[in-house]
């Protein structure tokens, strides 16, 4: 879930989703989700809350949201389904899903040291978990859903992020990514189980989340290789390609703000070319997952989500046809 700087002139942009043209209502929802996170922040002690609000405000700032627009970092429909499912249009439900999305990102950035684990950062994580527990408990009671469903989703997420098993191939790599998306599929599953949404939403969000991981890996080949991360692309390389990838890694994986690893030899076009076939296969897998998500949305009659998914997939297909 990494952001990327604009490419230099003449350099192809990294692989990515097509830019979804949001309706005004969906854009308003996106900005509202940032406000739901600030509701959670407001529960923190004031000195910590001020620091966290300032930190969040620096992420995803836009012309129309000078206090921050955090969820521009998350592509639709991983959050926009809240607009398309009528039962999800409620402040408490929006806050629950905003907390679930941010928790995954927060944990990810804590793990890779993009965030300094100071008191404010750790307190927000605590408050996000508390929000998740309280709001899901209320929904389970209101909708007659077994609270064990929530426990199973949180356990899947924590097991997959705290001590993930070592994958054996791309299939098992994707399986782990599905487990790590368990917080994001929690609300869709509650909506389905509580009879508030047709079946298929949780699988749709899960397929999209895995596709996002694959597209992100395809965009971060250079960074992952020099950091010693065996991403999805690594699993699609030949034995010689994997050996070259591993040779690039450094024990500490320290990077500067440009993504360069200190002490690493320059990564030139030949290295990109050697990874191109693997990148193409990873993007093809992502496109297939998005196609499956399109089918689920179409079966549910959700034309708005179909449009979002087709637009996202078009960007992936364009990336897959482009030389790297």
Residue ranges, per PLM feature:
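Acidic, Mg2+-coordinating active-site segments of isoprenoid diphosphate-utilizing enzymes
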Residues: 105-130, 135, 187-194, 206-277
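All-alpha helical catalytic cores of prenyl diphosphate-utilizing isoprenoid enzymes
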Residues: 40-53, 63-77, 93-96, 100-101, ...
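N-terminal domain-start signal
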Residues: 2-115
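Short, charged, amphipathic alpha-helical segments
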Residues: 122-126, 148, 202, 280, ...
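Primarily interfacial, aromatic-capped hydrophobic alpha-helices that serve as membrane anchors
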Residues: 137-155, 159-164, 241-304
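Short hairpin/turn module used for nucleic-acid contact or packing/dimerization
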Residues: 96, 100, 291-324
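Short acidic/histidine-centered micro-motifs embedded in hydrophobic/aromatic stretches
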Residues: 113, 152-156, 309-313
């Amino acid at each position: 879930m990494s952001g990327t700087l604009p490419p230099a002139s003449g350099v192809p942009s990294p692989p990515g989703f097509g830019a979804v043209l949001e309706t005004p209502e969906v854009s308003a929802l996106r900005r509202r989700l940032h406000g739901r996170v600030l509701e959670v922040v407001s529960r923190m002690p004031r000195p910590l809350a001020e620091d966290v609000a300032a930190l969040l405000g620096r992420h995803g700032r836009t012309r129309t949201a000078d206090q921050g627009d955090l969820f521009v970092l998350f592509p639709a429909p991983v959050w926009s389904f809240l607009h398309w499912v009528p039962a999800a249009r409620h402040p408490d439900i929006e806050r629950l899903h905003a907390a679930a999305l941010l928790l995954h990102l927060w944990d990810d950035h804590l793990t890779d040291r993009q965030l300094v684990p100071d008191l404010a950062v750790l307190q927000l994580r605590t408050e996000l978990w508390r929000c998740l527990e309280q709001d899901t408990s209320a929904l389970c009671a209101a909708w007659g859903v077994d609270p064990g469903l929530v426990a199973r989703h949180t356990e899947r997420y924590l097991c997959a992020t705290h001590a993930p098993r070592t994958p054996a191939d791309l299939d098992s790599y994707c399986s782990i990514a599905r487990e790590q998306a368990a917080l994001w599929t929690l609300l869709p599953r509650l909506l389905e189980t509580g009879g508030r949404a047709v079946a298929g939403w949780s699988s749709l969000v899960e397929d999209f989340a895995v596709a996002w991981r694959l597209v992100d890996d395809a965009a971060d080949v250079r960074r992952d290789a020099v950091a010693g991360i065996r991403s999805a692309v690594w699993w699609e390389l030949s034995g010689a390609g994997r050996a070259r990838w591993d040779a690039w890694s450094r024990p500490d994986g320290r990077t500067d703000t440009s993504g360069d690893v200190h002490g690493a030899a320059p990564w030139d076009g030949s290295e990109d070319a050697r990874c191109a076939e693997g990148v193409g296969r990873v993007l093809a897998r992502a496109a297939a997952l998005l196609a499956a998500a399109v089918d689920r949305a179409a079966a549910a009659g959700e034309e708005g989500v179909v449009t979002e998914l087709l637009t996202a997939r078009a960007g992936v297909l364009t990336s897959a046809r482009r030389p790297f």
